[in-house]
Amino acid sequence: MIHYALSWRNTNEHLFDIAIRFIAPEDQPRLILPSWRPGKYQLQNFAANVREWTPNLRKLGPNVWCADATRGEEVEVRYRYWAGVLDAGSSYLDRSEAYFNGSNLFLWIDGLRSDECVLTVDTGWPIETQLPREGNELRARNYDHLIDSPAIAGMFTTQSFEESGASIRLVSVGCDTARFVEPMRGIVREQVAVFGELPVNEYKFLIHGGDRWHGVEHEDSCSMIVKRGAADFDEHFLSLASHEFFHLWNVKRMMPAAFAPYDYTAATPTRLLWAMEGITSYYGDLSLARSGYWSEQRYLRHLAHEIELLESSHARTHLSLAQASFDGWVQDVTRPHDRGNAWYSFYTKGEVVAALLDLTLRARGMSLDEVMRVLWAERILDEDAVRRVVDDPLFFASYVDGVEPLPYETIFALAGVRFETRRKRRALGLKVKDGVIESVASGSSGAAADLLPQDELLGVHGLRVHSTSDVEHALQESNTGDEIEVVFARNGGVMTRRVRLEDDAPTEVRLHIAEEDNALRREWLRRRG
């Protein structure tokens, strides 16, 4: 058994104190901190936050230590961890809460990863976690279970409801969740109807008010950061919560073979991220429609927005969905690069492709619901199984493995939905925020003007600009073929370019109900729970 202890001295320091006690399985046993965490398919640098380790620990590598001990000796090591950044996958400590994720905090002992773990938390604050509790001890089956079980300690509020034989708890810090109980009840009911069962007795949403939207799935819980003061807050909240809850089945229990068991020390590329995250996004938002929270037209408006996002990416013309999934590990969204032209989100295209696949299956008397039930019965999610159950090689060859244009008009027509496009206002193919260029579309006027991501855009056509909408405003009287002047700063210098406007205005997508009484659409969106 491995004994972990967590405490803190002063919340203003944002430092957790961690102690680990174990019997050394060998001489000089190694202790390792994960290089990434499940739910975030990128390598991360958690070890940079580790400091002040005891003298009996010696560092061997970026995230590897060894203990000064001989085989069979009882060892205790201590260290501190800085927890000053709040996101759903981090650990965080301030005067109102202690939020801890084991994948950031807890070293595992090489050779003892399958041993039972006990975590003692030294605090007078109440604690919420999915781990079973005996007194002040939290118990985990093994290290994987320990780090897949985040916890909140502090001044939280709780809303609870019963649904489908399980207790669902909304545990929140800095966010009022009372109004979400009934919508969440409907969402839970609809997702249970897809799979036919709810495989837990209790599920917890650990929710933090913050400055962004972010969620991470766990075995019997999820963590969410919700953006306080955001427009359409309730819709975003429910969409995120619905997405994370669907992971209870898809990914947490239907796990690709590549992740069984997890290798926390290295990247684990897979071509299935589109199914793991894209199908989850599809059902997350579909559940809002099926539960009645969204109207049919509101759901179609959401799908149209996702299609717009996808179609705005040049990468869709040369990068398959399977390859975008595989390449997710090398896409660092925090660093400036040409990501918009080289890659797109497997969440976005995965959701769009899942919707088109579902409608295609329904036209032949099947559905994606049935596919998910078969995969759930087999407790499997791998490429061969998905393709075998769907049994449509041409669809996969064209839209998952290939880069064929997606047949929106034809497939949405099956559901009595009309697909329409029109040109938006031109913006040189740029996305601009706070005066800084975030992306430049390949083949656009902005690319012809030699603009790069992270350039400071100073002026367009004689006007000062700070945002994409400012660029649109500056060009509202201009036409294709007109020559305009662009002023920007790069590498400490100011540059001016003259460029001829291309026909590169982005596309606006609209989905309209064309047939009021369409049997396929009615069955697709009807309430099931």
Predicted feature residues:
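C-terminal recognition in membrane/secretory proteostasis and scaffolding
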Residues: G284, W294, R298-G529
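Post-HExxH zinc-binding segment in Zn-dependent metallohydrolases
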Residues: C222, R228-G229, R253-M254, T265-R316
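Hydrophobic residues positioned within well-ordered beta-strands of beta-sheet architectures
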Residues: Y4, F16-I20, V75-V77, C117-L119, ...
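A generic structural motif
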Residues: I23, D122, V487-A489
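Non-catalytic architectural context of zinc metalloproteases
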Residues: R9, P38, L43-E52, N56-V200, ...
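Generic, well-ordered alpha-helical scaffold segments in large soluble proteins
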Residues: P183-V194, L240, E244-L248, K252, ...
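Juxtacatalytic substrate-recognition/specificity segment
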Residues: F161-L273
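Early extracytoplasmic/domain-onset interaction patches
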Residues: M1-W36
